[in-house]
């Protein structure tokens, strides 16, 4: 791990520093970073920097690792500031017995081609033979083609649906505008999926050459016998949709079918989910035993996340599911 870190950030001083550290301290430094000792000029200008930069985005674990069936994909991050995150996740999946799998399909920590980038916010396994992916600013067509080939060959995936995202800061990943929230429901940002502004959608099928363009995401899902009903992020008003999508209103994580975790701030979205049969449960009350979620009940566990949302993601971004029961 030290050697691979030095491949990304070559430095004799860093090599000497890391080589002397016990394992626990080494992990702390790899995550929290290591300040460089400031010389006279840097100190006078208050311009001291990091010998090894910290990893403030590591809590967005979804991007760096993906579990598809029994296999693992290590992300190939778009920006160099996150490259050392790949090394940590790769070390976990390759060497820790608790993270044993059927194999690592693709290890982005070995990838430095600029045209091969892949982040987990763009990868959505919906069924054992179906994955939806986003072509975004963070995930490139070359990497998506490679992912499709690996999924078809080794994972039993039959269909991959590709959503072509706009190059906008509000849609850096597919999970900022689309997430599945129950077996037959998904949460979407309406302008990108409903009406004249809808995004282009492609369907790639194992054993079929090329791709087929689809009228929209819901037509593509119907074509592979996986119909989903949309719930609108922000409700019916465009202004609410835009505001709540910006604050990760589409970014929920399902802890079981029909039970979600999301931000409490997105009130119009919560109201839409309530109309779909969800009950809002505040996380503090759940943890204190003041409220409970019954078996088979639809519920949203809400968290405040006032500072977390400023990082540009939600609960789905901050979780890396390791095992999924079959639907």
Task: Name every feature range the model reports, one short phrase each.
Residues 1-327:
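The feature marks the mature, well-folded catalytic cores of soluble enzymes
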